[in-house]
Amino acid sequence: MKNGIDFVETEAYARIYNFILMVDDSIKNSEQRQSKHHMDVLADITRIVSETEKDPSPQRYANMAAKTVFKKIYDTYDDEYLRNSFGNQIRLDYGTGHELNFLCYLYAQYCRGSIGIDCVFTILVKYFEIVRLFITKFNLEPAGSHGMWGLDDYQFLPFLFGSSELCNTTLRFDELDGSKCYFVAVEKKLGGSSRILKSIMDKDWASINRGMIRMYDDHVLRRSVVTQHFIYGEYLRKDRSQANKDL
């Protein structure tokens, strides 16, 4: 970064990484609850996506009516993390940086006391569903793709937290159904086939989960192409983290 401090050295990185571990632990060890307010927000965004008609003219890439969806979200909500959680309104694309914005939105909500840590997963599952609807309906472009060497051209967290949900089970993948986040993520994967997903199919869920956390850190949080436009704020500051100050 131009100011001499890399994202992984910031307080924001330390906090969001710790938040991931907290959510992971909650999914494994606590009954998950719903937050009516946040589910209502996502239901409203689902309505916006569903009711916005596609542009009927020939479209080479993303359908231009997606701009209408972005405008409605921007006009309805003023939270910068939430506004930027559904893609880029100029490029009409979506990727893990936008997914990270939604995680940051939930972190800020958690810090304000608006949600408990045991509400995060249920909100995320609904968010994943909306994103898939938005991408498939309006043909949003992937904001960076690893092709067959990646998990998914658009999303990562459904696999990470989906594996958290399965760590205390002995279920094999072929025994899963649509009630499990990981199964839905694989079945509705956006993009081509994934060699990584195939290679880990026979591993135990705890191993898959640990690998997903490491991979998310390496491929999302530590990638400047993802974090170069990170939105810093009250709870996710650009200050150097205490751990790095002590080095």
Curated annotation (Swiss-Prot):
GO terms for cellular component: cytoplasm; nucleus; protein phosphatase type 2A complex. Its EC number is 5.2.1.8. It comes from the Eukaryota. Keywords: Cytoplasm, Isomerase, Rotamase. GO terms for molecular function: peptidyl-prolyl cis-trans isomerase activity; protein tyrosine phosphatase activator activity. It catalyses: [protein]-peptidylproline (omega=180) = [protein]-peptidylproline (omega=0). It is an enzyme of class 5 (isomerase). Gene3D superfamilies: 1.20.120.1150. It is found in: Cytoplasm. Pfam families: PTPA. One of its GO terms (biological process) is mitotic spindle organization. Belongs to the PTPA-type PPIase family. PPIases accelerate the folding of proteins. It catalyzes the cis-trans isomerization of proline imidic peptide bonds in oligopeptides. Acts as a regulatory subunit for PP2A-like phosphatases modulating their activity or substrate specificity, probably by inducing a conformational change in the catalytic subunit, a direct target of the PPIase. Can reactivate inactive phosphatase PP2A-phosphatase methylesterase complexes (PP2Ai) in presence of ATP and Mg(2+) by dissociating the inactive form from the complex. This is Serine/threonine-protein phosphatase 2A activator. It comes from Encephalitozoon cuniculi (strain GB-M1) (Microsporidian parasite).
